[in-house]
Amino acid sequence: MNLPNKLTVLRIIMVPFFIAAYMEKWFFVAFALFIIASLTDMLDGKIARARNLVTNFGKIMDPPADKILVYSALCLFVENGTIPGWTLIIILAREFVVSGMRTVAASEGIVIAAAMSGKIKTVLQMVAVIILIIAVGPVPQLKTIGMLVFWASLVMTVYSGTEYVLKNKSVFSM
């Protein structure tokens, strides 16, 4: 297994430790784990492209690894009342629609590349989570900023999902 793939696997392995730290109210540890895991997301793709180490494993496993990390944090925020549950349902619905469309396209031999709006959505979600971890814990003054970034990520989630469906509507006739 090459280094980028190891980083992707590491990100997935870190999720239960992040959840445990957050639930134990070890917010600094949860914060550090989430930041490290988020950095592995940035590094795995850069290393894979720079060193010509792009693999099917990486292409397939990187997006779910990101989602497992971010959505586990969002579930924790719903559980403690930081964000409303309906927002998580919108986010998950977008992911199911996009993933379903990608699966149908792939079954026809078509690869649909990730759009910039989807990448922006992911970055906004990660930034919101990072701020909200600290806001729920030691620095509650950051909650307003964290929630503003979260709402921006929700808008980008809806926008990127809509853009994806409209650009790839031919998938519905496959």
Over which residues does each language-model region extend?
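Alpha-helical transmembrane bundles and membrane-interface segments of multipass inner-membrane proteins
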Residues: 1-174
